[in-house]
């Protein structure tokens, strides 16, 4: 009999990942593979989105349960966000964007967990989601059956530390995050409770890109035939190092080269941050050498990676396990990145030019850009090694690794 597994997603963005989101994309991978392998009876909790619901209607082996957020809750969130940004002048005002929605979502999921009976429950990446277990007697009901999947460092426990400690296992996206989780847990942290599930991407999606797909994007971006491209992908947040990359790119002054910045501050919701406005000012000095695409649908990303001569992902914080790094390697592209957080567990020196973060980071990044863009044989070597490294990075292996870390012993059929 199939095990009944529930995944509780963030409640911020819908499943499948029609509005983007790294965690949402990983959940979608598990769904896609379960549709083929059908090893578990999978249920995923998500906030409602009409497009996502339409896609999920075709699933045969997975049920997505949507929590529809009332208009009054959405309006309340907009008011809270406006107050935090404009009156309180909060620097991290985006953390106030979905407070009411999350509380409503947690309540809805908690009530449904009480009605249902699952063999495994996986809480995805935010301590507040433990409210789904603490309420309605679910912590006792699912004791020994629930897991926490950590994609980031925990910055606050929101009163749920004991619920967190009672997890059957704490699954992390890198050893870096696993070590941080142990610090949160405390000195008594039992080693067997901590497990690592390395991130993956849909390798078919990222490797099956046609020349026509690439030409289409080059035309959209008005690139000349002799233009080479440095590509950055991701949210335009300060910790991603995009400002430093733009400054380094301007300083490097590489002939016939454009910097293509793919992404926006907060996915597809139209918000523009003060930081984005600052980036636009920096780009003015580069004239047409720096191109902003804005939000790009995730299904279009493989062509943009394929278009790149080099991908640069210069995180200046302890990035746990950025999917953008994994995507670039999976496509087989030369990579420039940093040795921050969990990045070195994915991007090793044989596939990437590693730039240490220091006071002279912009200068060091400038040198790295000139080195990689100026040496075609070096770029080809990095690309070949990336293709070899990613050969075993498959959606199927991610699915079976996921089953194993939640104590469902299934061997991958190769």
What are these regions (language model features)?
Residues 139, 273-296:
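Nucleotide-activated donor-binding/catalytic signature segment of Leloir-type glycosyltransferases, i.e.
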Residues 171, 224-240, 246-249, 260:
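Conserved donor-binding/catalytic core segment of Leloir-type glycosyltransferases
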Residues 295, 304-308:
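Short alpha-helical donor nucleotide-sugar binding micro-motif in glycosyltransferases
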Residues 258-277:
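Glycosyltransferase donor-sugar binding loop
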């Amino acid at each position: 009999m199939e095990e009944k597994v529930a995944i509780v997603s963030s409640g911020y963005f819908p499943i499948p990942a029609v509005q983007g989101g790294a965690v949402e994309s990983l959940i979608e991978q598990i769904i896609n593979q379960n549709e083929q392998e059908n090893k578990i009876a999978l249920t995923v909790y998500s906030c409602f989105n009409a497009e996502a619901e339409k896609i999920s209607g075709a699933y045969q082996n997975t049920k997505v349960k949507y929590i529809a957020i009332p208009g009054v809750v959405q309006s309340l969130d907009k008011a809270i966000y406006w107050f935090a940004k404009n009156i309180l002048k909060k620097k991290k005002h985006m953390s106030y964007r979905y407070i009411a929605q999350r509380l409503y979502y947690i309540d809805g999921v908690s009530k449904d967990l009480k009605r249902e009976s699952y063999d495994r429950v996986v809480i995805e990446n935010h301590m507040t989601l433990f409210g789904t277990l603490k309420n309605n007697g679910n912590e006792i009901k699912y004791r020994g059956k629930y897991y926490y999947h950590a994609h980031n460092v925990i910055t606050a426990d929101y009163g749920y530390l004991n619920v967190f400690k009672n997890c059957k296992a704490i699954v992390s996206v890198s050893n870096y995050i696993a070590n941080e989780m142990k610090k949160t847990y405390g000195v008594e942290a039992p080693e067997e409770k901590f497990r690592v599930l390395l991130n993956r991407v849909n390798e078919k999606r990222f490797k099956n890109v046609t020349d026509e797909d690439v030409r289409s994007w080059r035309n959209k971006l008005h690139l000349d035939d002799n233009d080479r491209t440095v590509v950055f992908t991701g949210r335009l947040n300060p910790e991603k190092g995009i400002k430093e990359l733009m400054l380094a790119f301007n300083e490097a002054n590489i002939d016939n080269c454009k910097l293509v910045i793919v992404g926006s501050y907060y996915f597809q919701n139209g918000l523009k941050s003060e930081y984005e406005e600052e980036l636009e000012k920096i780009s003015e000095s580069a004239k047409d050498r720096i191109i902003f695409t804005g939000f790009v649908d995730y299904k279009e990303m493989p062509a943009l990676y394929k278009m790149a001569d080099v991908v640069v992902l210069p995180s200046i914080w302890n990035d746990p396990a950025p999917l953008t790094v994994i995507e670039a390697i999976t496509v087989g592209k030369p990579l420039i990145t940093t040795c921050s957080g969990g990045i070195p567990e994915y991007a090793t020196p044989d596939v990437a030019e590693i730039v240490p973060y220091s006071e002279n980071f912009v200068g060091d990044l400038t040198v790295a850009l000139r080195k990689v863009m100026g040496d075609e044989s070096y770029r080809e070597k990095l690309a070949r090694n990336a293709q070899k490294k990613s050969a075993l990075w498959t959606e199927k292996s991610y699915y079976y690794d996921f089953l194993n870390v939640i104590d469902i012993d299934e061997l991958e059929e190769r």
